[in-house]
Amino acid sequence: MSTDTLVKRPTRSELIDRFHSKIRAGEPIIGGGAGTGLSAKSEEAGDIDLIVIYNSGRYRMAGRGSLAGLLAYGNANQIVVDMASEVLPVVKHTPVLAGVNGTDPFVVMPTFLRELKEIGFAGVQNFPTVGLIDGLFRQNLEETGMSYAQEVAMIAEAHNLDLLTTPYVFGPDDAVAMAKAGADILVCHMGLTTGGAIGAQSGKTMEDCVALINQCIKAAREIRDDIIILCHGGPIANPEDARFILGACPGCHGFYGASSMERLPTEEAIKSQTLAFKAIRRKPA
């Protein structure tokens, strides 16, 4: 048996204590999505606090838009299980969470969550999520048994299994529901990340985000004052954006990046490096 397999992973309560210690010290909690083992390894090298893997990570690092994760291009829950063997062995000490499709009608959720814990995941997040869907389509999903309430139930079940839970919320009502379900960290989702080659071109303004995040914070704190709040998505795409939000939302404890943590940096770095090589000039023959 290798030394790595003997490493004791921190418990949920130990992780929460760690995060609260950082908050008291004025340090932001920074989480990130990883669509490849290299992304996860690099994020850990940057001292990230938590890593989440889910189907959209694989899609975006394959050059497809993140919303591909909401469409029928693959089994989201099986993709996460497949990604585990790529990511978990190369992450040495950072908690890795699984994105779970809570509305999957082909999964016995308590059994699946126990399997994820046994594989080595420290916790879960609700992704893919119907929270990103609106209009009549969302209404019909809710009416036909594929609802956000099922995602809340999944988070509650994960909490009962002592898994760390970091669900996406999209408004105050979601924040209340997830806080009541026992969620440890709420991630206020501001929509698809804008910018880059395959990012959204339209979305909320920063001012819109400030108002909505503060509403979510207020609603969640009325249920539990110990809950941790992070921001994610929309126009919050780089460190300066996150700094602005944390300054304008004192109750927000940090940032969770997905496209902003692996896609945008990769796009920029590879393009820049390629252009630098292309700029080399040699004497004509």
Curated annotation (Swiss-Prot):
InterPro entries: Aldolase_TIM, Pyrv/PenolPyrv_kinase-like_dom, TIM-br_IGPS-like, Tobamovirus_resist_UPF0261. Keywords: Plasmid. The keyword Ligase does not apply. GO terms for molecular function: catalytic activity. It holds the Pfam family PEP_hydrolase. Gene3D superfamilies: Aldolase class I, Single helix bin. SUPFAM superfamilies: Phosphoenolpyruvate/pyruvate domain (SSF51621). PANTHER family: UPF0261 DOMAIN PROTEIN (AFU_ORTHOLOGUE AFUA_1G10120). This is Uncharacterized protein y4oV.
